[in-house]
From Swiss-Prot:
The presence of a 'disulfide through disulfide knot' structurally defines this protein as a knottin. Belongs to the asilidin-1 family. It comes from the Eukaryota. Expressed by the venom gland. Is the most highly expressed peptide and is around 3000 times higher expressed in the thoracic glands compared to its body tissues. It is found in: Secreted. Disulfide bonds join C26-C40, C33-C44, C39-C49. One of its GO terms (cellular component) is extracellular region. Its main location: secreted. GO terms for molecular function: calcium channel regulator activity; toxin activity. The keyword Signal applies. This is U-Asilidin(1)-Mar1a. Keywords: Calcium channel impairing toxin, Disulfide bond, Ion channel impairing toxin, Knottin, Neurotoxin, Secreted, Signal, Toxin, Voltage-gated calcium channel impairing toxin.
């Protein structure tokens, strides 16, 4: 029984990691931002992604 719990834990960690990677997608021009790194190829100026 313990093996099933272990396998499930590993799968849950992998699933969470994949979701986190997808969630870190960049924001397009005009999107709200806090840091330059949030914008795809733009800068964060006045809380908006600018080219």
């Amino acid at each position: 029984m313990a093996n099933y719990i272990e396998v499930f834990s590993v799968l849950a960690i992998i699933f969470a990691t994949v979701l986190a990677a997808l969630a870190q997608d960049c924001s397009p021009e005009g999107a709200q931002c806090v840091r330059d790194s949030e914008c795809c190829y733009n800068e964060c100026i006045d809380s908006l992604c600018q080219p």
